[in-house]
From Swiss-Prot:
GO terms for cellular component: plasma membrane. Belongs to the UPF0382 family. It is found in: Cell membrane. It comes from Bacillus subtilis (strain 168). The chain crosses the membrane at residues 3-23, 49-69, 71-91, 96-116. This is UPF0382 membrane protein YwdK.
Amino acid sequence: MKVFIILGAINALLAVGLGAFGAHGLEGKIPDKYLQVWHTGVQYHMYHALGLFVVAFLADKLSGIGSVTTAGWLMFAGIVLFSGSLYILSVTQISILGAITPLGGVAFIISWIMIVVAAVKYL
């Protein structure tokens, strides 16, 4: 599906840019603890940007299987919630934002389960 190729590419681009920003723009400006949190956000951002390409491939191969599309939107939501909350937490150091992160993690897990089920069931 075209939308997931576009989302995957945009998110991979953002992950690379945000990784570079963390390494060169934030180093020495935020505590090391929060720099590591930033890098965790970047790492999961890239993993799931690539995951969106997997969704695009499966959505093309299994057209009409709504669970694959749902998995893609959950994965995208996971990027926003998980990585997004870690980025904001890193620069603001507002610890309550850490409560949002697990919601993104759950979205990631559910999306991967849905991909596995669709692959086993329909491929």
